[in-house]
């Protein structure tokens, strides 16, 4: 069960088609596994369609959407429906079946990375897969810009809590952390960065000029 979700504004931007392709992929992967957020987006899609038909020039504040979504969240859960037949996910189409067999490049300590930015031509963000070995620690770092991350496999923990598979995380310049992979398997994440991270450890910070 996912515990960390995109905020209302991000879901609104996704529903409106305003997110970049890499950010939209992160949302789509989360929605595939999160009925709660999927229901919210379905509602936003329906509201958007009505607004386009009846009042295309009327702007609606985020607080109104939050109020509507809160009402939906408070309603009793609907009866479960039969699961749809298995289909190839957006992730499988992009990277194949086995994430562990990708051509990972060892970076620092327990961290391996794979830059897949070239799969999103015309986009300004850096799109990176990161693998943290089971029980391993990532170097302490902060961010020079915004970083959107979704957990694809395993889990990691930092001072903000534990982030499990399909959890959605957004960090910025004010956030500094040192993730640790928890559980028995490697933790693999997909991150979209507007700028490189900034290492903050006593010795690792010397490597910052070489990070691109």
Model-derived features: where do they sit?
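Positively biased amphipathic helices and basic secretion/translocation or surface-docking motifs
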Residues: 1-9, 22-23, 32-35, 46-100
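Glycine- and acidic-residue-biased ligand/ion/polar-headgroup-sensing regions
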Residues: 133-136, 142-158
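Short Cys/His-rich Zn2+-coordinating modules
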Residues: 12-22
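Conserved short histidine dyad/triad with adjacent acidic residue
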Residues: 113-119, 123-143, 172-176, 210
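Ligand-binding loop in jelly-roll beta-barrel domains
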Residues: 175-199
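Short acidic-glycine-tyrosine-enriched beta hairpin
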Residues: 158-178
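Short beta-strand His + acidic residue motifs that chelate non-heme Fe in jelly-roll/DSBH
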Residues: 41, 138-141, 159, 177-183
């Amino acid at each position: 069960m996912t515990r960390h979700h995109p905020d209302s504004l991000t879901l609104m931007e996704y529903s409106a088609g305003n997110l970049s392709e890499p950010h939209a992929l992160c949302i789509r992967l989360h929605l595939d596994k999160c009925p709660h957020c999927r229901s919210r987006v379905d509602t936003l899609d329906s509201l958007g369609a009505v607004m386009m038909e009846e009042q295309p020039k009327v702007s609606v504040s985020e607080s109104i959407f939050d109020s509507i979504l809160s009402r939906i969240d408070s309603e009793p859960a609907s009866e479960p429906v039969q699961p749809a037949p298995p289909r190839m996910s957006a992730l499988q189409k992009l990277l194949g079946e086995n994430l562990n067999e990708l051509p990972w490049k060892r970076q620092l300590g327990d961290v391996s990375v794979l830059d897949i930015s070239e799969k999103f031509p015309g986009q300004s963000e850096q799109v990176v897969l990161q693998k943290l070995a089971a029980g391993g620690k990532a170097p302490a770092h902060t961010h020079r810009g915004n970083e959107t991350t979704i957990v694809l496999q395993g889990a990691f923990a930092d001072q903000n809590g534990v982030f499990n598979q399909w959890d959605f995380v957004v960090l910025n310049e004010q956030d500094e952390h040192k993730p640790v992979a928890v559980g028995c398997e490697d933790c693999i994440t997909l991150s979209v960065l507007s700028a490189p991270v900034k290492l903050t450890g006593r010795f690792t910070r010397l490597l910052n000029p070489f990070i691109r």
